[in-house]
Structure formats: C-alpha cells, structure tokens
Amino acid sequence: MTTTDATRLTGLDAALAETTDALFALQRPDGSWEGRLSASPGATADVLIAMHLADPVGCRDLIERGLAFLLRTQGADGGWGDDVDTEATLNGTALSVAALALIAPDAAAEQISRGWARVEQFGGAEAVRDVERCSLAVLVHFYLVLAGLMSNEGLLRVPIELALLPAPLRRKLTFAMPTAMAWGLMCAELLPAGRARAAINRAATPPAIAYLEGLVGFEGPDGGFVESPMMSANVCIGLTLAGLRPDIVRHCLKYFRATIKPEGAWAVTRDLEVDATNFITAGMQHVGLGADPRVAKAVRWIRAAQRDEDFIWTGAPPGGWGWGLPSGWPNSGNTGDAVIAIAGDGHDVRDEQVRRGAQWLLDQQNYDGSWSCFAQVGRLATMDPSFAMVGKARSPKVLYGPCAVMSAEAVSALGLSGMCPPGDPRLTAAYRWFAKVQHPDGGIDNKWYLGRTAGTGSVLRALADVGLAGSPVARRCISWLRLTQNSDGGWGDALGPGRSTVEETAMAMLGLCAAGVDPAEAMPSRGAGWLVEHRGPDHLWRPSLLGVYFLELLYRHDHTANGYALQALARYRELVRRGGTTSGAFARPPWTATPDPGKTV
C-alpha cells in the first residue's frame, strides 16, 4: 500500500465513522430508519381539496395548516414546484391555485391572482387541457373547474369501464388504478349518460367498488391507498362527489391526519422506510459493521416487512417487499434491495426468506428479460391502457414498463443471494435487455430517477455483481461515466448539465467500484472526494429533487442520498484497500461461484 493510499484510507475511515454515527443516531427503536420524503405543494393541495369536500368542519385544523403551508411556500414568480424552494411546475402551480381558490377565495385572493398569472405563463387553460404539457391534466382541469377558474370544456371522463378490463391490462395501470376506479364512479354519477353509457356504468360499478374495498382490506385500519396521501385524496374526492362509501371516505380522512408532516403539508407518498432501511443497512455492511447489534436489528426489521400474501391488484405473488408499512405495494426495487441486505447479513437462498424473495423476482421478470416496478409485462399484454384516462397513449411517461434501475436491483439480488449462478439463462436474458436499451454512447435511461446517470451506474453495479464487469455493456457504461463526470468530480445530468448530485455521484461510484476500476485513477478518487466534501455539518448529505413518483411528479428522499453515498464511500475504501479488486465477503459472498471477470455474454 502506498503512502497516498494510506492517507486516502485515513480520510475515508474518519468520514465513514462520522457518517455511520450520525445515521445510528437517527435509527428508530425498532431498528428501521424513517426515510423522510419531501413535502409536496401538489400533494398538499390535493389533500386539502379532499378534506374540504368530505368534511370541512372535522378537518378544519388540518386544512388551516395546509393552507398556511401553501401561502408561505409560493415562489417569487407566483408558482409552486414539486417541492418547496424549487422551480415552479404547471402541476404544482395549478393544483395549489385550485385549492386556494376553492377553500379560501377571499383570504388568498392576492396569492391566487399571482398563481394564476404563473399558470398563464405556462400556457393557461390550453396547457392545462394538454396532457403533453400538464401530465396531471385529468386532475388539474377538474379541480380548476370546481374552483371556478376554468370551464368544463374538454373535461376528460375517467371511464368506469376500466373496472371491466381483463386483469393483465387492468394491472398495468398499477397505482393509478385506485384513482381510476374512484373517479370512474364519480364520472358515472355526475356526467350525462345515454342508454349505452348507463348500462356500462351499472355493469362496472360493483367491480369498481369491490376493487377499492379489497385494497382497504389489504391496507388495514392505518394504511392509505397505495400508501400515498395524494392517491388517497383522489379516492376520497371521487367517492365523496359520487355519494358512495362514506366508510372508505372516513378511512382516507383518518389517513390524512396520520400522515401530515410537521410543516403542515403532505408528501406524494408516505415515507420510504423500507427503502431507507435497505439502503442504510447495506451501507453499514459494506463499512464492515454487519455484526453490530444495531445492524442486526435492522436486518430483523427488514425480514419482518416481507409480504406473505398474494397481491392480486398487480398479480404479484407472496414474498415481496413494499416501500413502507403497513401497505406499500410489493415491487421489484424494494424486494431486490431487501434480498441484498439479508444476503449481506450472510444468508443465501437456503434461507427461506431469501429464497422466497429471490423467487418473487424471478416470477416477476418480464418476457424480454427486464423487470418493471409492480407488474410483470408479458408478450400478450403490451397495450398501454393509460390512453383511456388521458385521451392518448403516454408510454414514455407511465411507470408500468421496464426500468433499468429496477432490473439492476433484481439482477444484483439474484446474483448475490446465490439464486442465479453466473451464466444462468435468466441473467443472460437480463443482459440482453440491458444491451438492447443501452444508447450508442453507453448511457442507459430509467423510469424512476431523472437523467441517465442513475440507470447507467446501477446497471454497471449489477453486471459486476454477477461477474460481467468485463462485458461490452459494462465497458460502455464505464466509458459513459468517464466522459460525463462533471468538472467538480461529481456526476449528475438529472438537474441539468454539470449539476452534480449526491444520488447520481453515489450511483456512478457504486458501479465503478463494483466493476473494479483502478482506485488510483483520478475518476473514482475525485468522485469519492466529492462525496466526502459535500456532507453537511451533521456529516450527512442533502437529497436532490430527482426521484420520479408518478406522471412526472418529483420528490426528494433523504436516505436515498445517505444510503447510496454511504455504500459508495465504503466500497471505494474497500477498493483502495484491495488495490482495485472487489473480492470481499460482502461484494462476492462465499456461496457464489467466482466468475471470470473478463467473461462476456
């Protein structure tokens, strides 16, 4: 080891000690981490409208707090973004204006006027009606009609006949489906209908209600629809205006009270506690703290969060993990990360929970070798049903389709758990899909984060985890990351050229370290330096607005930043110690075969 390496390790050791201490201080008594999502003006406006329509008296205290949040977070340009102190968006601005105009038209008259002026700058009513410019056009237009700011000309009907679709198509709407069912019931009740339409409405109403009832049963008394205040608000509004199921409406109102944030606002979804605990636990294991009782408690919590029932709403089998409790939907990303964390605790597929989680991933693999988030996509179920809700197909913007990050998490889990040895045909199919979607310059898109860095770094890490660090796809990923490193040493294309973020820098570094790049090279050394230097006074990192929730709504998640950055620095330290090899107990578990690093598919 050179003097330079020793100096570098000393600095990394100190940084990791400070960061792990800070994270342990945030660990909850049950072993998990909260995973705080940013407050969303758009989600807050949606919830306010729901409470105002359903129970304005009983929810008066919550409504007042939410209105105060919107009033103090309006931007200097009159708009609202998807988060506070971020660039205004048409979705965030129009939703906030609608809530203020509906609930406090006199008290907030000046703010409404400024907000509507910002909507006009986005293109006004014409832009609101255009699903290409306003991704939440169905919601936004309707709320502005309720508030008296737009006419109902061009108002889109949400067709209740979605409840009659064959299950493979209905499942592809994934977490849009609860909104579709409730708003379909509302449209059936409120909008004019001829004889044929009335017959369709009568036929579709019972299965639509049964769908919502079933989800309430899955959620239990404390859950929300899709574990989301925003989706729960949509269900509450639809059923309230349809005059149906006041019991489900009360269920939603109870959920709003349970999920309000200290600042008086709501996030697009409940906090991502499973994500947070998975990410941080894996980071602690990479640091070398896997035997620490606090990490062992986190692993036990992850085990307890595994779902034991079929999830009929997406067709998923038992054995998966969702993003939060009690009712996050099982999905490929959380399941892959949970399997990785349990495997990092020293367990392979001989462990029943690891085996079930890995089998869940295999059962959910798409026909083309990829993975989507929630639902498996088969050869015959390729139609995009979202056109029925917005008047045209929006395949690039819906989230049921394959995702590089989700696929990468699944591949890593299957390899590190020992479920799929090198050369397994399921991994070969995944590799071929990565090769298919990789751009000629080596970058790879994904659906759940902005930009290409997240997809490219995640795929590189996954390929290295299954012994394909020397494959053509991996080499092109490395080349792309080399060419796109920013001048400050970080990575990031999500927020614009040259704007490095913690999440993207960490994901790039994870891929490079897993692939075994030379730690003495400037590229990984500068990336690690950027991460160390960009911690806050609390030794943790600040998240960026690059997570994609649904139809272009964005969010920030504190422990996506902290967990991935911790993993990246720990894996870089291991790379330095081993002189550029990645053969560690965690990076290459003893139960997996050691493949030829130069092998290609």
Predicted segment positions?
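Preference for long, amphipathic alpha-helical scaffolds in soluble/luminal domains
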Residues: 1-601
